[in-house]
């Protein structure tokens, strides 16, 4: 007689995509996008992810993703133009290297229009996706340059050149962290950020 194991493995995979649009009404329609700036996988803070899952199962406070954070410490451009990437922060009391801006993405807690989360599942499969969306409109963040073709922008020091993003709970646990080639946010650009977390069960 074969005894069925009560154990299974949980794996979380993440993927980030940043798409630029010119008009807010086009957001979500990739056929009208200006360009895709980032399309890559992310790193997961395994300890904090385990805390998040346990809280969600027990229906406890801070058991969901609450904010998407943007930073400027994920990459450095050297004098020769080479991009040096920082190692994603996935252990201990981790945070973004240089956090500068965030968006609330929990649409059950007054997230701005366009920011939302959704769960997607295909019957019969052993994975489910959490799709987390944030839209940074033309007037966000305050103080950015009017156009992205303005000269003199320092890719290493500007507060509006993002090169790292992380997802956090409301009590500030960093669950994911991804670094990427610097992307400048200016007032002529609308960014849609789609962050997908795939929760996979392996028996």
Please provide the spans of the model-predicted regions:
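Small cysteine-rich, disulfide-bonded extracellular modules of the LU/uPAR three-finger superfamily
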Residues: 1-162, 171-203
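Generic short beta-strand
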Residues: 164-166
């Amino acid at each position: 007689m074969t005894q069925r194991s009560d154990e299974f493995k949980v794996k979380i995979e993440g993927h980030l995509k940043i798409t630029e649009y010119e008009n807010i009404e086009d957001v979500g329609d990739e056929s009208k996008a200006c360009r895709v700036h980032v399309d890559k996988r992310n790193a997961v803070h395994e300890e904090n992810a385990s805390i998040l899952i346990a809280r969600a199962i027990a229906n406890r406070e801070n058991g969901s993703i609450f904010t998407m954070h943007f930073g400027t410490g994920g990459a450095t451009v050297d004098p020769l133009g080479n991009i040096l990437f920082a190692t994603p922060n996935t252990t201990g009391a981790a945070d973004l290297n240089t956090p500068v801006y965030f968006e609330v993405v929990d649409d059950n807690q007054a997230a701005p229009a366009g920011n939302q989360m959704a769960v997607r599942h295909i019957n019969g499969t052993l994975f489910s996706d959490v799709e987390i969306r944030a839209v940074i409109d033309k007037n966000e963040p305050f103080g950015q340059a009017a156009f992205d073709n303005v000269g003199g922008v320092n890719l290493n020091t500007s507060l509006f050149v993002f090169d790292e993003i992380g997802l956090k709970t409301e009590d500030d646990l960093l669950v994911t962290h991804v670094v990427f080639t610097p992307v400048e946010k200016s007032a002529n650009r609308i960014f849609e950020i789609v962050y997908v977390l795939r929760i996979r069960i392996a028996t």
